[in-house]
Design a protein with these regions (language model features):
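Residue-level marker of alpha-helix boundaries and capping positions
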Residues: 45, 74, 138-139, 189, ...
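Generic structural signal for well-ordered, non-membrane alpha-helical segments
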Residues: 6, 10, 44-51, 80, ...
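Catalytic alpha/beta core domains of metabolic enzymes, predominantly
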Residues: 104-106, 111-239
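Conserved beta-strand edge residues that scaffold enzyme active sites
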Residues: 72-73, 101, 140, 165-166, ...
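A glycine-rich helix N-cap at a beta->alpha junction
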Residues: 1-2
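A mid-to-C-terminal "edge-of-domain" accessory segment
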Residues: 188-296
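Alpha/beta enzyme core
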Residues: 7-133, 149-154
Length: 296
C-alpha cells in the first residue's frame, strides 16, 4: 500500500493488519531530489528525520516497509546513499528506486542501479542478496520499456509497470510490453497467451485508449495490407510453416501471445493479398474476380 512517509499514513495499516490478520506492506515514499527539496523547503536533515520517525514506527508495529525514494533519478548520489543507508539501518529490507518524472535513459538506469547495489547497500553493511531492489519507471520520454529492460539487466529484483502504461501524465512503464520483451529475450518463460485479453479488459474497464498501432495488442499490430509483405507471409503459410509466417515480417511472433497474422486488402496490396483474403473468407477464387478487385 503506497503511503507517505508519515506516522499518520502508516497507522491505518496497523489497524488493517490486526483486523484482517495479514501483512500489508507500507510502500513509504519520500522525495529526495534537489528540485523537490527546494520546492518544499526541505533539507537532508528534515528528510532523514521524517524517514526515521515513520520507518521506525512501522517496524516497531510489525508493518513491513518498502522504502521508496521519489525522483531518485534526479537526486544527488550522496543524498541517495545517506537516506537509503539510514532506512536499511532501521530494518528496511526492500527499497524502490524511482524515475518519477520519466527523466532517465537506459544508460542512467544501469549506472544508478550499479551505484546502489555495489556501493550503497554494501557500504551500509548489508549483503545485496538480502535486500530486495525494486525499479519504478515512467513514460515521459517514451523510455519506460527500455528502462525496465535496463533495470532487469542491471540486477533489479522487481520491475514495476501498469497495463497499457496507465498512469499520471504520459503514464507508467507498460507492463504488457515489458513482459513481451522479457519473454523474447528468453529470461521469462511464462505463458502470455492471456495477456491480450487482460489488456483488452483494462482498455474496456478503465476507458484508456488502445491505439490500433499499439505494439503487440493494437488491432493493427500483426496486420499487413502491403503486397510484398503479405506475399511473403502467404508463402510461409502455404508451406504450412506457421513459425516462419509469424516471423518473416514481424519482430514479435503473434501466436506466442494468443494472436495471429492478419492479411488485409488495401491500396498497396498485391494479388496475393486478394487471393488469400478470398480463400479465407469463403469466396470462390477466379481470375476475373481477382483482377476486378485488384483494379478497383
Amino acid at each position: 500500500c503506497a503511503v507517505r512517509t508519515l506516522v499518520s499514513d502508516i497507522t491505518p495499516l496497523i489497524d488493517l493488519q490486526s483486523k484482517y490478520d495479514c501483512e500489508i506492506q507500507a510502500s513509504a515514499f519520500l522525495g529526495t531530489s534537489p528540485i523537490r527539496q527546494y520546492t518544499e523547503g526541505w533539507n537532508m536533515e528534515k528528510i532523514l528525520s521524517t524517514a526515521e520517525k515513520a520507518v521506525s514506527f512501522a517496524i516497531e508495529n510489525d508493518v513491513p516497509v518498502m522504502f521508496v525514494t521519489e525522483d531518485t533519478t534526479r537526486s544527488k548520489p550522496e543524498d541517495i546513499k545517506e537516506v537509503y543507508t539510514r532506512a536499511l539501518e532501521l530494518g528496511v529490507e526492500r527499497i524502490c528506486i524511482c524515475d518519477t518524472c520519466g527523466h532517465v535513459t537506459p544508460n542512467g538506469v544501469n549506472k544508478l542501479l550499479s551505484f546502489i547495489q555495489n556501493e550503497v547497500i554494501p557500504d551500509a553493511g548489508f549483503k545485496r542478496r538480502n535486500i530486495e531492489v525494486n525499479w519504478h519507471g515512467h513514460q515521459d520520454r517514451g523510455l519506460g520499456v527500455a528502462n525496465n529492460i535496463a533495470a532487469f539487466e542491471s540486477g533489479a529484483d522487481v520491475i514495476h509497470g501498469t497495463a497499457l502504461g496507465i498512469g499520471e501524465r504520459a503514464g507508467n512503464a507498460p507492463l504488457d510490453q515489458t513482459l513481451v520483451n522479457l519473454s523474447l529475450m528468453g529470461v521469462i518463460s511464462n505463458d502470455l497467451t492471456a495477456l491480450d485479453e487482460y489488456i483488452k479488459k483494462a482498455h474496456e474497464y478503465i476507458k484508456i485508449p488502445l491505439p490500433r498501432n499499439y505494439p503487440i495488442f493494437g488491432n493493427d499490430a500483426f496486420e499487413t495490407g502491403t503486397g510484398v509483405h503479405a506475399s511473403a507471409v502467404v508463402k510461409a503459410m502455404d508451406k504450412g510453416d506457421h513459425w516462419l509466417a509469424d516471423r518473416i515480417y514481424s519482430g514479435v511472433p503473434a501466436t506466442d501471445y494468443g494472436l495471429k497474422q492478419v492479411i488485409r486488402i488495401g491500396h498497396m496490396s498485391g494479388r496475393s493479398n486478394i487471393i488469400w483474403w478470398l480463400k479465407n473468407n469463403g469466396y470462390e477464387i477466379t481470375d476475373k474476380l481477382v483482377e476486378y478487385m485488384f483494379n478497383v
